[in-house]
Amino acid sequence: MIHSKKLTLGICLVLLIILIVGYVIMTKTNGRNAQIKDTFNQTLKLYPTKNLDDFYDKEGFRDQEFKKGDKGTWIVNSEMVIEPKGKDMETRGMVLYINRNTRTTKGYYFISEMTDDSNGRPKDDEKRYPVKMEHNKIIPTKPLPNDKLKKEIENFKFFVQYGNFKDINDYKDGDISYNPNVPSYSAKYQLNNDDYNVQQLRKRYDIPTKQAPKLLLKGDGDLKGSSVGSRSLEFTFVENKEENIYFTDSVQYTPSEDTRYESN
């Protein structure tokens, strides 16, 4: 009888320990997931910034990587990648470096085509067209091969100018992951074609699929903030071995000395 009571007590103790450990793990996971969401929300608050000149007066996260007196540089990047079945992958996008010290903005528009070389290995053929930004207008700084490209560049809009995530907290069934070894973190949501941001992308790009995209928010570095880390977002419409259609965007705040770029 005494042995039976001890056995029962032992089993109850083990179950209690399991419940406590499970509760601690669940609480820690929920807390980290909430922190990941909050980290992304801090970046998504920038959307929309319709006038890019406003970035001259915006300050992002600063750490010891910034030198005294450096106001920092914003890097904005938007690009659309389309690889239809049986065709080459083409990427069109733009990168701007918005220097808060000099209140000047330079960058480039690029067109990249992924083909195979004579040995069947992937080859990335990219052309860059230098631009500057004045009074929220994109201006090519070198002659362009045709008026169509000139118009395409001058009319280009970054996703941060029209994207809006005011309803991000209403997104359902988010898949949140965290890798402490890098560290890296992400959040993935299945969208529908009625989503505002999806409609805006379809309005601006000829997206050759009716399939609704997944929204993937990606980040690396310290969750509390770091000028070394990065955050980006991706709308993935199609992703497989034969076909790829996705849109990527990022807005980064970095020390000005880390923003050297090249255009050809």
UniProtKB/Swiss-Prot annotation:
Organism superkingdom: Bacteria
Membrane topology: Single-pass membrane protein
Compartments where located: Cell membrane
Keyword Transmembrane helix: yes
InterPro entries, per database record: Csa, Csa_sf
Family: Belongs to the staphylococcal tandem lipoprotein family.
The protein's name in its UniProt record: Uncharacterized protein SAOUHSC_02783
Organism: Staphylococcus aureus (strain NCTC 8325 / PS 47)
